[in-house]
Amino acid sequence: MSFCLLNDNGVKMLFESNHQKYSKNDLVAVLKNAGICSGDSICVHSELFGLGKILKTKDEFLNDIISALCSCVGVDIHKPKSSLGTIIVPTFTYDFCKSGVYDKKNSRSEVGILGEYFRKLPNVYRSDDPIFNFAIFGKDAGKYKGFSLSCFGEQSIFKKMIDNNVKFITLGTTDTGCTLVHYCEELLQVPYRYYKDFFGKIIDENSIQKECKIKYFVRKLDMPSMLSVPKMKEILIKDKAIKIYTLGSAQIGVMG
């Protein structure tokens, strides 16, 4: 049996942390305080269980998270033409590197439940990259269509997000890093990575198959290297490139 707790004002509560209950409205308030506003384009990386004890069913919880994001940037998932902002959520499919198959409708996201939920909503577009794909909805969704020959190259979705002034949000934690760092690594041509070609097929929204080849700037296994998220976070804070907010015991980071 599903149930939701209510606060004194009759608002259904979303999660509990440190003996305090929080609603969708609390999340909206934090995001707005962080500078997220109507018309923004946002890319949301999440670790939702970092928020605390969930007080709703999984689908109700995920729906409220998406609803909060929509509310902040001016998006109505049922009225795409009226949207003012854009929401972008990772739905990466690393399995393509082994299986050689990326099915835009059926390949499950391997990076969290929010993207897996979001990509199945009506009118949500899933990008073409067979490894680093995103679910996208909103005013600027059309800008992210098209195939890039390199996961992090000049035609990639990461470059497009930079060009379109997307704000990057880490929801639930700031300790897991952000995939954008790999775009920077390719841009700088760091010596501990190299291009590796992956071959396979993409099955699009209309079940049409096409062969593809994509370059992935992968780590050199014979060259010691380690991504230090604490160091990266330290630099971002020092350079005032990230703002960190708290909701319960969880952190919410905003860059851009």
Regions found by a protein language model. Give the residues of each.
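N-terminal and secondary-structure boundary signal
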Residues: 1-256
